[in-house]
């Protein structure tokens, strides 16, 4: 017979996975499109290091007039025109799935890429257009500082769009900026092969 004075507590854990990843940019949080993470939090720290940021746009990733995400690369320099090696002279705007958690000792480890996914992806598609910077600068390290050097090659400035599928042994394990392009855990990669200027939206 059951003892009416005895109770048991059970903890039920439910795993939830995304079955469809669609990011249409229609809904935005305080800084980023819902479901995505940007480099905005990192850019917010740059003025604390003496970096001069432009007033427009307000950050590396903002909502454009047509509703798209506008991603901008900045020349991130101090008033005297250079930086310590901690900050590159050219800082690219980024938008990705995952989380941003600042790592002062290794800034590339601040981006923790990816979301748990337990389905076989059937396709990866996106819509974009791209305007290269003008003039074109390249970040060059010299004498322990990063400098923005003017480059004659206009084709050097191209956009980069890629999707990675990787296998890990636990949900706490992620890839970051130091290993996403070299890790053996990456089993599939889709990448834009033509990053040159596109004045109209491409799919």
Regions found by a protein language model. Give the residues of each.
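Short coil-to-beta strand junction motifs in C2/discoidin
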Residues: 141-161
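Extracellular carbohydrate recognition and processing domains
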Residues: 170-203
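Surface-exposed coil/turn segments at beta-strand junctions on protein surfaces, enriched
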Residues: 5, 16, 117-119, 197-199
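Solvent-exposed strand-to-loop "edge" motifs in beta-rich extracellular domains
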Residues: 25-27, 74-76, 114-133, 140-148, ...
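Short carbohydrate-recognition loop motifs
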Residues: 62-86, 90-93, 98
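Extracellular carbohydrate-recognition regions
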Residues: 4, 8-59
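Extracellular/lumenal carbohydrate-interaction signature centered on repeated Trp-anchored short motifs
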Residues: 88, 92-124
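Extracellular structured ligand-interaction cores
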Residues: 20-22, 66, 112-114, 118-125, ...
């Amino acid at each position: 017979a059951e003892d009416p004075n005895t109770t048991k507590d059970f903890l039920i854990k439910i795993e939830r996975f995304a079955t469809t990843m669609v990011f249409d940019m229609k809904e935005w949080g305080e800084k980023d499109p819902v479901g995505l993470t940007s480099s905005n939090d990192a850019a917010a720290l740059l003025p604390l290091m003496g970096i001069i940021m432009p007033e427009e746009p307000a950050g590396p990733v903002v909502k454009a007039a047509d509703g798209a995400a506008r991603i901008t690369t900045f020349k991130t320099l101090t008033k005297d025109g250079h930086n310590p090696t901690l900050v590159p002279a050219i800082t690219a705007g980024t938008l990705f799935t995952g989380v941003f958690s600042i790592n002062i000792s290794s800034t590339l480890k601040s981006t923790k890429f990816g979301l748990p996914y337990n389905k076989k992806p059937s396709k990866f598609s996106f819509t974009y257009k791209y305007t290269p910077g003008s003039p074109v600068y390249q970040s060059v390290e010299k004498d322990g500082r990063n400098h923005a050097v003017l480059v004659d090659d206009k084709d050097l400035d191209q956009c980069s769009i890629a999707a990675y599928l990787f296998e890990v042994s636990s949900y706490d394990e992620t890839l970051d900026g130091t290993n996403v392009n070299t890790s053996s855990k990456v089993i599939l990669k889709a990448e834009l092969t033509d990053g040159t200027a596109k004045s109209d939206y491409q799919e």
